[in-house]
Regions:
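Secreted/periplasmic carbohydrate-active enzymes, especially glycoside hydrolases
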Residues: 1-132, 136-140, 180, 195-196, ...
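Substrate-binding/catalytic cleft of secreted carbohydrate-active enzymes
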Residues: 107-110, 117-271
Length: 271
């Protein structure tokens, strides 16, 4: 046991109370790193008198990181040049109904191939996915479900506009995107493997008349992400379009340039 804290509170029936607890400072903790993924565990126990009513375990890790525009990424003071892979949460024969064993197998294979970063393409993944990244030492780019699929045809097509063309659909769509971002951060925030929250993937695959509201939604989700978790940067994934004054790569802290994005002169090459 590294540290413990106990708080008591008398509550009336059916009352709700939030406990705010802080342990003493932990001296020289082992730092989480892909090469040595040290993890700790918080055990939260709820008692009624001497009777244990509930118990919940939360794994977490200590690490610090820094993203820089000119020197790249640093983890615990060490410069890392990412060797990353896009990984979807699906399997042949299973589709999206992937077992946790299947997820762990995929992550182990990526690790054994020499990679150190996974981009969770292109939606929130299962907590088991993040947990496995923690346990085996895999950095994780966690992404929200706001993405274009290669075009901007009308509703009902596989490559429909990333942002709704019909104004009557927009409020519900935006609420859904923001709700999923909130859930993503609340569910996965304690995972040390996660070093960035991504707002999107290629949302520029949208109808021309929706470019402005698409950009506005990105700005709002970036702001929301920072409110919910100021410790991690907010990224715009798949930000290689559009060019000019409508570009989206500068709306967040970090931008991902997919496909030909690294060859477009307007974009700075990675550090």
């Amino acid at each position: 046991e590294v540290s413990s804290v106990s708080t008591s509170q008398v509550l009336p029936d059916n009352a709700t109370y939030t406990f705010e607890q802080q342990t003493k400072e932990i001296q020289a903790p082992q730092l989480w790193h892909p090469n040595h993924p040290a993890l700790y565990k918080v055990i939260s126990s709820l008692y009624h008198g001497q009777e244990l009513i509930d118990r919940y375990e939360t794994a977490f890790g200590f690490r610090w990181f820094e993203w820089t525009a000119d020197r790249g990424f640093f983890l615990n003071g060490e410069h890392l040049y990412f060797k990353g892979a896009n990984v979807h949460q699906d399997h042949a024969g299973w589709g999206d109904a992937v077992t946790e064993t299947g997820m762990r197998r995929d992550i182990r294979l990526v690790k054994e191939a020499g990679f150190d970063l996974i981009r969770g393409s292109h939606y929130p993944h299962s907590p088991a996915f993040s947990q496995t990244c923690d346990e085996i030492g895999m950095l994780f780019w966690a992404e929200n479900a706001f993405w274009g699929i290669g075009g901007h045809k009308g509703d009902g097509y596989w490559n429909a506009s990333a942002y709704p063309v019909n104004e009557s659909d927009r409020a519900e769509f935006e609420n859904s995107v923001k709700a999923q971002l909130k859930e993503l951060i609340h569910i996965h925030r304690n995972h040390p493997s996660i070093i960035v929250w991504s707002m999107s993937n290629e949302p520029f695959f949208t109808a021309p008349e929706t470019i402005d509201p698409m950009r506005k939604l990105l700005e709002e989700t970036v702001k929301l992400s920072k409110q919910l978790d100021p410790t991690r940067p907010a990224a715009v994934g798949g930000a290689q379009r559009p060019l000019g004054e409508k570009r989206i790569d500068k709306l967040g802290d970090i931008a991902g340039y997919n496909g030909d994005g690294s060859y477009i002169p307007e974009f700075q090459q990675p550090g």
